[in-house]
């Protein structure tokens, strides 16, 4: 279930800045038919920090409703307060959510023991599978492999989204965790190399606009056909890079609108829209990758 191309889904909004449920359903349907393995709802790319708690829960539950059992839905439930993360996680205890994705606490920068106790407390509050999420560039703290190995011994902590982009981490984690512990990349640029070293998939920003391509890339990688997967990856490389020309999800939401996947290009402050210069760069990347001329994928 937790392998292959897992999309870090954007949260579409209408011109009033409220969640656009029509576009959200369209996105879910698109991923169902495109080979995406699962959906992460309201993670970093889904603007978790820009939604109220009520909206956060509603978007996850709407995504689950629109999926209707066709794709597993993983709920983003991280917070920098342990009590808040526990409360948010427990909102989904009686739902059909497949798992929770829980980011390391941001801003307060806990030490390694604090990280261990944080995730231990969350896992003890629920029976839902927990996927750890390490993204130091966003949070200001780095969960080290030795801490992950301690957490991997907890029954319902089943894997990690490792988004440092440091491929040495894969080798370190492989040596320290049990063989069933799921290793997912959180960095599209290095995802294929991550999978070559033992990862089983990626929680992908690129999959928002290249769902079929990312699904095929991951399928080939999991079949050890890295040569063919590399051809796809090379074609997508301009997009992997351009989607981070500004803070995520500013570029990817613009690309989704350009490709007709959503109705409006709207973000919430403090996120602002992509500059004209960066739009030109991203548009060229879409053209170079062939995505701009293959819009039949997005009907």
Swiss-Prot record:
- Give any Gene Ontology cellular component: cytosol
Q: Which UniProt keywords apply?
A: Amino-acid biosynthesis, Cytoplasm, Diaminopimelate biosynthesis, Lyase, Lysine biosynthesis, Schiff base
Q: Which domain of life is it from?
A: Bacteria
Q: Which reaction does it catalyse?
A: L-aspartate 4-semialdehyde + pyruvate = (2S,4S)-4-hydroxy-2,3,4,5-tetrahydrodipicolinate + H2O + H(+)
Query: Where can this protein be found?
Result: Cytoplasm
* InterPro entries on file: Aldolase_TIM, DapA, DapA-like, Schiff_base-form_aldolases_AS
Report the EC code(s) recorded for this entry: 4.3.3.7
Disulfide bonds listed in the record: none
* GO MF annotation, one: 4-hydroxy-tetrahydrodipicolinate synthase activity
CDD domains, per database record: DHDPS
Please name the pathway.
Amino-acid biosynthesis; L-lysine biosynthesis via DAP pathway; (S)-tetrahydrodipicolinate from L-aspartate: step 3/4
Sorted alphabetically, which Gene3D superfamilies does this protein's record hold? Aldolase class I
GO-annotated biological processes: diaminopimelate biosynthetic process; lysine biosynthetic process via diaminopimelate
Q: In the UniProt entry, which residues are flagged as the active site?
A: 133 (proton donor/acceptor), 161 (schiff-base intermediate with substrate)
Where is the site labelled Part of a proton relay during catalysis? 44, 107
Tell me the residue numbers annotated for binding pyruvate.
Answer: 45, 203
Which proteins does it associate with, and in what oligomeric form? Homotetramer; dimer of dimers.
Functional description taken from the UniProt entry: Catalyzes the condensation of (S)-aspartate-beta-semialdehyde [(S)-ASA] and pyruvate to 4-hydroxy-tetrahydrodipicolinate (HTPA).
* PANTHER family per UniProt: 4-HYDROXY-2-OXOGLUTARATE ALDOLASE, MITOCHONDRIAL, DIHYDRODIPICOLINATE SYNTHASE
Question: Into which family does the record put it?
Answer: Belongs to the DapA family.
Full protein name: 4-hydroxy-tetrahydrodipicolinate synthase
């Amino acid at each position: 279930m937790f392998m292959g191309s897992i999309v870090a889904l954007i949260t579409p909004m209408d011109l009033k800045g409220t969640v656009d449920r029509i576009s959200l359903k369209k996105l879910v349907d698109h991923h169902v038919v495109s080979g995406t393995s699962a959906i992460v709802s309201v993670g970093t790319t889904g603007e978790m920090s820009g939604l109220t708690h009520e909206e956060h829960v509603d978007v996850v539950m709407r995504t689950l409703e629109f999926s209707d059992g066709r794709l597993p839905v993983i709920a983003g439930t991280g917070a920098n307060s342990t009590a808040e993360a526990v409360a948010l996680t427990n909102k989904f205890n009686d739902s059909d959510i497949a798992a929770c994705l829980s980011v390391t606490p941001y801003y307060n920068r806990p030490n390694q023991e604090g990280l261990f106790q944080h995730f231990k407390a969350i896992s003890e509050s629920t029976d839902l599978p927990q996927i750890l999420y390490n993204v130091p560039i966003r949070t200001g703290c780095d969960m080290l492999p030795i801490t992950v190995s301690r957490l991997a011994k907890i029954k319902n902590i089943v894997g990690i989204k490792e988004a440092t982009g440091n491929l040495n981490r894969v080798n370190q984690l492989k040596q320290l965790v049990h063989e069933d512990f799921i290793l997912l990349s959180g960095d599209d640029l290095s995802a294929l190399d991550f999978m070559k070293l033992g990862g089983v998939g990626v929680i992908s920003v690129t999959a928002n606009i290249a769902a079929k391509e990312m699904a095929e890339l991951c399928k080939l990688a999991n079949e050890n056909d890295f040569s063919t997967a590399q051809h796809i990856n090379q074609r997508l490389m301009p997009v992997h890079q351009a989607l981070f020309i500004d803070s995520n999800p500013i570029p990817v939401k613009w690309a989704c609108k350009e490709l007709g996947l959503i109705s409006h290009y709207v973000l919430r402050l403090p996120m602002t829209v992509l500059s004209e210069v960066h739009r030109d760069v991203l548009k060229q990347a879409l053209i170079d990758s062939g995505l701009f001329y293959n819009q039949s994928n997005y009907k």
